[in-house]
């Protein structure tokens, strides 16, 4: 199975080669474990995630995969249907007092890439020790996450 490793501010890979729905679900599962284990150590933070994606191919599809896994794992997700930039997710994570933010984006990488960027509760990049915790929870098998979502348009 493909070994997922985070680099600067997240994990990046070529869409449909290594950046697949199955691999995104694996990272979402690891993120959910990190959120559940660590958010309880901060009394003012919710065990919740703000999620957004850029305009690259598959952003909404990959976001849906993240939401399915997070819902299955009991982590609340705040998601804007449509494009949400990294600064928007950072601000939302901070202002809504969520433990983490996730952005489906490859930032400056070529269009064939996508990525999974983690933001911490303060809105900035996730610290290396926390990234290591997330990586330690990435399973070496696929995650079965049925669609248990209810989307509300407001």
Question: What are the residue ranges of the model-derived segments?
Answer:
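Ferredoxin-reductase
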Residues: 40-122
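Alpha-helical scaffold segments in soluble metabolic enzymes
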Residues: 10, 26, 30, 88-91, ...
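Short, surface-exposed, polar/charged, turn-prone segments marking secondary-structure boundaries
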Residues: 32-35, 77-80, 106-107, 128-133, ...
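Generic alpha-helical secondary structure signal
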Residues: 22, 87, 128-132
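An N-terminal, well-structured beta->alpha segment
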Residues: 1-73, 99, 151
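Pocket-edge positions in alpha/beta enzyme catalytic cores
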Residues: 16-19, 81, 123-126
């Amino acid at each position: 199975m493909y070994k997922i490793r985070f680099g600067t501010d997240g994990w990046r890979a070529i869409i449909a080669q290594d950046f697949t729905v199955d691999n995104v679900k694996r990272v979402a599962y690891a993120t959910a474990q990190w959120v559940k284990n660590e958010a309880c150590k901060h009394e003012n933070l919710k065990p919740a995630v703000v999620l957004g994606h850029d305009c690259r191919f598959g952003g909404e599809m990959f976001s849906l995969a993240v939401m399915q896994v997070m819902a299955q794992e009991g982590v609340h997700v705040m998601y804007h249907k449509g494009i949400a930039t990294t600064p928007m997710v950072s601000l939302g994570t901070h202002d809504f007092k969520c433990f983490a933010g996730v952005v489906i984006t490859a930032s400056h990488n070529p269009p064939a890439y996508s990525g999974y960027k983690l933001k911490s509760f303060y809105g900035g990049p996730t610290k290396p020790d926390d990234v290591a915790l997330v990586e330690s929870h990435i399973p070496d098998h696929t995650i079965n996450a049925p669609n248990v979502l209810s989307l509300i348009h407001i």
